[in-house]
């Protein structure tokens, strides 16, 4: 069972590794997204759930980051962990997001990526390698965070 992160100062932890496993999930509209489809871009993969208060709290900053860096070079993929589509749709009607929300029914991807606490995020560089991980809530629109992610963008 997953736990929600307690209130502590989460930070970007630098790593240099391949993603834990392939990502291939459908979004709430039924469109399939594969991590490989985004090769050449920076991808922020965020695992979350509507019942997770820190997850809900960080969503606006993820949306601001998507809007700030949201060129063809950057995308947020929010992986919802095993919740009914109706619950996710209700959440999205109250908090529209400018990035895809993917459905991990049965938590198969969540387990494959070894996510045990929500929210959990992975920043994947254009070459397909994980460059940062975060466990817990983070203000993704904080200038220092934006700067670190922007440095990964192609042409930077």
Residue ranges of model-derived segments:
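N-terminal "domain-start" segment that seeds a small globular fold
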Residues: 8-35
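Thiol/disulfide oxidoreductase modules built on the thioredoxin-like
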Residues: 90-98, 104-151
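N-terminal signal peptide c-region/cleavage motif recognized by signal peptidases
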Residues: 4-6
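Structural signature of beta-strand start/N-cap positions in the alpha/beta core
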Residues: 41-43, 73-75, 100
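Short loop/turn microsegments at loop-to-beta-strand junctions
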Residues: 20-21, 43, 118-120
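Structural microenvironment flanking redox-active thiols in thiol-disulfide oxidoreductases
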Residues: 56-95, 105-112
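Hydrophobic beta-strand core positions in alpha/beta domains
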Residues: 44-46, 76-78, 122-123
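Short active-site neighborhood of thiol/selenol oxidoreductases, capturing the structured segment around
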Residues: 36-53
């Amino acid at each position: 069972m997953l736990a929600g992160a307690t209130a502590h100062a989460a930070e970007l932890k630098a790593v240099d590794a391949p993603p834990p496993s392939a990502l291939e999930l459908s979004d709430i509209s039924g469109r399939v997204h594969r991590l490989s489809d985004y090769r050449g871009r920076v991808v922020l993969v965020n695992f979350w759930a509507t019942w997770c208060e820190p997850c809900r709290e960080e969503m606006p900053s993820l949306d601001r980051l998507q809007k700030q860096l949201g060129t063809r070079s950057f995308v947020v993929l929010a992986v919802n962990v095993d919740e009914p589509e109706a619950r996710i749709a209700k959440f999205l009607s109250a908090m529209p997001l400018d990035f895809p929300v993917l459905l991990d029914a049965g938590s198969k991807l969540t387990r494959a990526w070894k996510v045990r606490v929500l929210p959990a995020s992975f920043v994947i560089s254009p070459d397909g390698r994980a460059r940062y991980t975060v466990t817990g809530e983070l203000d993704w629109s904080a200038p220092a965070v934006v700067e670190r992610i922007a440095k990964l963008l192609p042409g930077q």
